[in-house]
Amino acid sequence: MRHTFQSFWIGDRISPYEALCMRSFIDHGHGFALYCYNSRLKVPRGVELRDASTILPKDQCFAYSTGFGAGSFSACSNLFRYLLLQRFGGWWVDTDVLCLTHCIPIYYSFFAREDDDFINGAVLYFEPGDRLIEECLRDALNLGRNVVWGQIGPRLITQKVQELNRGWEAQPASTCYPVHWSAALDLVDPRKTAEVASSTANSMMLHLWNEIFRQAAISKKCLPPRGSYLRMLADRHPVAGWRGLYLLNDGSDVCMPSALTKVRLPARDRVKCIAGTLLSNRLRPLRTSTAGDRHIMQVSNN
């Protein structure tokens, strides 16, 4: 069945990762409405832009100031979804959620576990005025801006689900969180593709865990390595804006390990190193052959 999914964006541009996620919903026949403060924001064809200020004035947006996630607008996004769902109801998805199927059932409410401990809020469905959302909104407003990562997100939703004895409604992690956040980099590791494909075989959606990618300094402007699960989806739902491709120095595609270390290079390059692979927001292709995507990359000082 066709559904319309709602989300929220702060900023003047989206990366190819967000575009890929939105495009996946459109390609599966669903609607996608993005609330933002820029009416000229470039988004994939078929995405409907809506005025976010009708839900939350821009001057009330805020980011985490300290700790894990510092600089992220995730807390503001949590508040926004509670305001939106309390008022209008419907589907909510974060901008780092991929749609994997056109076949999504009708729910009277939807929330799913990310693991045995927490309910995640990246994918939600509620009718307007649902008590669970009203209580999340009330507590989020009372806590204000001085919150830490997850405090008004998964932790708050989990707390309210328990207090209202609604744990029986929680869907299994396999519906939307088949890849746990601790294994997020498996999505861009060609060695893990079969394992990820098996985990997602019966999933409706896939959460990409954007903050894990951000903490690992994975550029969202570079195509994932060829052969990885995320690259397979990027090829299936093509979008514009990719500025590079992750490759090994010998020209072969990179297998992403779990460890990330910095390379001491000029500050203007901001280059990271993963197992001998130079990665950067400033990578650009020097040459592209007609066979596949064998780009040779260099650091651009422009």
Language-model regions, residue ranges each:
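Small-residue hinge/turn detector
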Residues: 78-89
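Short aromatic-hydrophobic micro-motifs that form the base-stacking/packing surface
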Residues: 91-93
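Glycosyltransferase-associated regions of secretory-pathway enzymes
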Residues: 1-77, 95-302
